[in-house]
Amino acid sequence: MPNILDYNKFCENLEPVTSVKMFKKRFFHAEGLFSEQIFGPLKNYTCQCGTYYGKSKSGGRCKVCNVEIANSNERRKRFAKIILPIPVVNPLMYDLIVSLGGKAIKAPLDNLMKNEKSILYVIGDETFVVHDDEKIPRTATRYEKADAIHVLVKSFSEMMYEDMEDENWKKLVLNIDNFLIREIIVLPPDLRPSTRSGSQQLMDKINRYYIQILTKKEVMQASFLTAIQDKSIYYTFFRNLQKDVKELHEKILEKLAKKEGLIRGNILGKRIDFSGRAVIVPEPSLSLDECVLPYKMVLEIFKLQVAKRIIGLGRFKKLPTALNYINKCIKFNHLGLLDICEETIKGKVCILNRQPSLHRLGMLGFNIKVSQDSVIKVHPLICSPFNADFDGDQMAVYIPLSEETIQEVKDKMFVTKNLISPANEELTTLPSQDIVLGIYYLTSGRFDDDDFNGLEHFNSLLPDEFKTVTYTVDEKKLISILDQVRIDFPDKIVGLLDDIKKTGFYYSTLSGCTLSLDDFLIEDVQKVKDYIYDTGGDIYESLKRSGSNDVIEFLKNNFRYADLIESGARGSWDQARQLCLSRGFVSNFSGEIHDKPIVNNLTDGLTQSEFFDSTYGCRKGLLDTALNTGTSGYLSRKLIFTCANLQLSDSVADCGTKDFLEVKVTDKKKASCFVNRSIKDENQLKIITRENYGDIIGKTIKVRSPIYCKNDKICQTCYGESYKTLNSTFIGIIAAQTLGEKSTQLVLRTFHTSGSAIIKEGADKKDMKQEDIIGDLSAVSSMLHKFKDRKCEDLVHDLFAVYDRNVYHVHYECVVAQLMWVGMKKWRLCSDRNKYKPKFHSIQSVPDQESWMLAMSFSNPRKSILHGIINSGNYSGIMDKILRGEKV
């Protein structure tokens, strides 16, 4: 970022704009706001009069119209200036000195700027702002107008620096000559466009302020001598000019900020060529790293490469005719180029993306195949990382072009390189539904006979050294087996996943599972209903009975598709109860349970009153999904930019900190979230593994944490051994994506809730109120914005309590570590942390501390520009580095 304080140096070599006129004859005026002579040509390498054109003439100037022969992109880069007849106060410097000095400088400064009778007197080291009629000693030095403002600000800044020795005041003292400016920066014309519509000239609002300033400049120059002699006329011109300059700066800041601003809309915005979109369908014959694109899409995306190949084969001589033939093939779906397409895409890769991209697994790389169908075909097991299904979901296709990007996709973005979730190190390509059902049927003995044993066949798929499976394999057990194979035999997991896929589909097809309405009719239903509801009106007891083992056992023995639920392939016992036995109790908007149950089941049908009561509870889920998805997404976005600059060191193994985070481990689920972390055990560091994590249940452990890491980039010991599977050093973004993805999925999942009331196992009557997912989302947002007197341990604990416990504890710690600051420095990096109490910044304000670009585009632009002035050149945020072309 340039040094904003050095205003005069920036304007030093800029061309001046002197004319308020826009046009001269049919061209832009040579000295106006859109001059081709100042800002560059409108057409590439073509001068204004047309005498010179072509790239061969670049660098020179036309001898007739004096326009430089250059690329028209120069009109987005070249600045100019307006020279003012009298100096005015730099609005940015004014805001800065007032924010640092407060009322002590604001009152006298405003007095000198607005009151024409105000005069500055200096006696020794003291300054006084007085009116003409006040008595002042003759020994005092008198200053008026701009000189008075300059002397006041300079003496005040020097005094504050001597008293406080603050670096901010030092920067002001060194750049105090920029407080009064005689030049206004003019933005490049393409950033403030002007177009003609009929007889009207439509232009950006910023241009109107430039025109006002130029007009007042001309008026003042016409009466310059009078303005110098008459103080009231001088102040009238000064106030009007100062007002226009201030409004101009505010408009420029507005143009930078917000979603449509230059930073988010243009600089940080994505512009993607060579892309497409289509509906996805499963293709079991593919390998994990393969996808099939439609023939017409491949022709369109690889149009130039296909054209080059058919020209090389001698079928066409010129590019336009080859492209014309390709366009006809696309229009009429002609297959004459199918073979050439297949040759063209050899060695090419693509990136598939399904929106919403909640985490990095939402964009994965694939090798390309081509088919004549109009859909994208993918491997069935990639649904889990994309959170996709095959009910009409669409995916976008992006084609990397350069050799470096293609290699990066192969090394880091292929599915086989992302089998492990960054959230919890579990397998991402999980089998489900048909595959799970097929494996369940195979291992349950349904297909066994004298010549075939299902368990033996299943064991033959596993590595030879793996422990023999002797039990029926449902979804949980299958995932556990695959996870263990991934850990023990990492080179065999990809082949095993394909074998499991083929076997599961084959045996689920052989099972011939079909559904009929008659299959949901069960005998003796009335006896079970009487058992559930014959409790004298006790709702708690009825709810307890409806989910009891007796009812589930009854369904297992009488429901024809119990295997679907038992295997984990589809459905739940609560859904089966509603279909076959009774809809049960429903809850209202606030989670309170109605005292009147819906006795009928969904197969027999509901009465009118039962149907109304039934729909009453599920409306909340639909409304929550519609209203809160955006809120959750914005929370995720703020989390990303809060944690974007937190990175893992690839060279520092241990920072040597002596501080530990104390955590009470209450149960097995929480203990598993500390796998691969280093804890303090009798003055030594001990690593928690999958084998010994049960030892810490019920204990308060001291764990090495990113919150206390002394290294700028988090050291490997404080983060834990999980860094080996991340394939990335940007642990802050991974943590933010993990929490953001979980919160968004919570909101989306409310769409599927039916309003049916349930109670959790072990809950008492006090816990009967139904779970409020949106309330949890509000709680998270409140935690990350309002901190009161919380300690970091409490904040981590509260976040962990709200979120899904299937997320490693270190991700919560990474987020909290980014919220703790002392001034402009992270608390964890202070040399003596015990001397300072950390100040918690909200996730809205943390980007201000590290990235000027993010602060300008997401926060208050005026406040952010002040941070930018103070820290000019010192920001090291990821976005700032990208814009400067530095390596991140």
Task: Show which residues each predicted segment covers.
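Conserved core architecture of multi-subunit DNA-directed RNA polymerases
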Residues: 1-740, 744-787, 801, 866
